[in-house]
Amino acid sequence: MVIEQQITGAIIAGIKELYGADVTASQVQLQKTKKEFKGHLTLVVFPFLRMSKKSPEQTAQEIGEYLLRNEPAVAEFNVIKGFLNLTVACSCWIDLLNSINEQPAYGIIPVTEQSPLVMIEYSSPNTNKPLHLGHVRNNLLGYSLSKIIKANGNQIVKTNIVNDRGIHICKSMLAWQKWGNGATPESTGKKGDHLIGDFYVLFSNKLKEETHALEAKGLTKEEAEAQSTLMAEAREMLRKWEAGDKEVRALWEMMNNWVYAGFNETYKMMGVDFDKIYYESQTYLEGKGKVMEGLEKGIFYRREDGSVWADLTKDGLDEKLLLRADGTSVYMTQDIGTAKLRFDDYPINKMIYVVGNEQNYHFQVLSILLDKLGFEFGKGLVHFSYGMVELPEGKMKSREGTVVDADDLMAEMISTAREISQELGKLDEMTPEEAENIARIVGLGSLKYFILKVDPRKNMTFNPKESIDFNGNTGPFIQYTYARIRSVLRKAAEQGIVLPEQLPLTFAISEKEENLIQMIADYAEIVKEAGKLYSPACVANYIYDLVKEYNQFYHDFSILREENPELKNFRLVLSANVAKIVKSGMDLLGIEVPERM
């Protein structure tokens, strides 16, 4: 904050004048004063005792008196033991608000052509089923993180790797071929991803029937699966796909295209997008090539059965399979290939993978392998590891068809938001189109905020009922406060009030108003911290705290009814800047805020 920098400079000058010692800004420990004490900023004086050769209280007293004489930003001070509590002058807070008011994008660092380029991968769906609740957390985290990293002055490429090949895809294809009767999204009235997901579940159920029948004849579960004709057919279909069989490839393309159309609808409703999409079917051969290159260079080794491995024991890990004995690739091989293609396509300075914490070991290994293969970005890749998400009813499974689909969840959230908003009268005097738009904004905002306010590294339970509440740490509470501020500003405009670009520095404001200005000013640091920690939760919880503080201010003070015109203008400018920061912060979370509600 500018005020802190100003006072820090004065403290450095004071230490020099009082004690003849040179100190740096990093040695000046200036922090927010605790709520139980009077003041805005507190200086810890203990580091200066060896220079002053006096008691903590006397040293604090001398520095306080120096600041009072020489720094206009300091209005008064008090000393508690070794702590110097400073009260900042009213005029400084108003001046700080003027400065923030001049900056439409306060707290956001502009991106230039010279800015570092960060690629962030998220979503990574399989084309055998719709996106589910786990994907929702992944997409929301990835999209928000891309906005936060961009707000920290980086160029961003949002990317997605679609897992469009493999045995799981062949299971859906085989089920459609055997029992689909030519079903299409058009003939069934279903989204393509849901239709294909149904066939994946159907295959799983048919496989269970077959293996249970074999187990009834005395076979073990493992023996039954090994003798399954369905699994044999699925493996044969995969072999044909890899061999480029025209019929299998045509079926694969048709069914995948149905899925992509469905995914696009889901992404659009969720409000996330991508700059570049990669497909595993295009990258796995690249990975094989890099592995063979590593084998030739002696980085990897081949076992007697023909499989290729990396020995990572010297790196504190184990041995890692890279190519099976039959020459087929594993996930690690594909990730190596995808990384190569990406760095061929873009001059990437940093690569971030948004993938659940069950893959921690995988990315630890990938980082080492890429480094061994000579990729400069290997050591610096970031695995943004996040926890699992569940509903109150328990975990999600996709094979049994009990998965919580993202589409169903979003539709339910919008429907619930519509009902609650109607009950509370928040849709009164709106056209049906406006009311539906508010239901969408509130429903999706509830979902996004509830997920993003949680520390991403923690497992969480998503509670739909809790998330749609117009009170407490929720999206609707923040959205409603924003709409309330916009309503105040509209009424001011209707009364002919034109907000000044610069407020005079000559009037007194309350402590609560000073606190609000301080909170607004903190936004720039919050954005930096969120980028540093890869945590949208930093932004979410800051916005909630800001809105909570504003609501208390709104309750305690008159705005439009204030008789003093200077104070009225000040409170309107203060309100406008709270709204500006709320909108900016919610945008970093990918959440819309309504102008009226």
Curated annotation (Swiss-Prot):
UniProt entry keywords in alphabetical sequence: Aminoacyl-tRNA synthetase, ATP-binding, Cytoplasm, Ligase, Nucleotide-binding, Protein biosynthesis
The similarity comment for this entry is: Belongs to the class-I aminoacyl-tRNA synthetase family.
Residue ranges of the motif 'HIGH' region: 125-135
Q: Which gene encodes it?
A: argS
- Name of protein: Arginine--tRNA ligase
Q: Any S-S bridges, and between which cysteines?
A: none
Q: What Enzyme Commission number(s) does the record list for this chain?
A: 6.1.1.19
Q: Which GO terms describe its cellular component?
A: cytoplasm
- Known catalysed reaction(s)? tRNA(Arg) + L-arginine + ATP = L-arginyl-tRNA(Arg) + AMP + diphosphate
One protein family per Pfam: DALR_1
GO MF = arginine-tRNA ligase activity; ATP binding
Q: Tell me which PANTHER family the record gives.
A: ARGININE--TRNA LIGASE, CYTOPLASMIC, ARGINYL-TRNA SYNTHETASE
The compartments listed are:
Cytoplasm
Answer whether the UniProt record assigns the keyword Repeat to this protein.
no
Q: What class of enzyme is it?
A: ligase
Q: Does the keyword Ligase apply?
A: yes
Question: Whom does it interact with, and what assembly results?
Answer: Monomer.
Organism of origin is Parabacteroides distasonis (strain ATCC 8503 / DSM 20701 / CIP 104284 / JCM 5825 / NCTC 11152)
**GO BP:** arginyl-tRNA aminoacylation
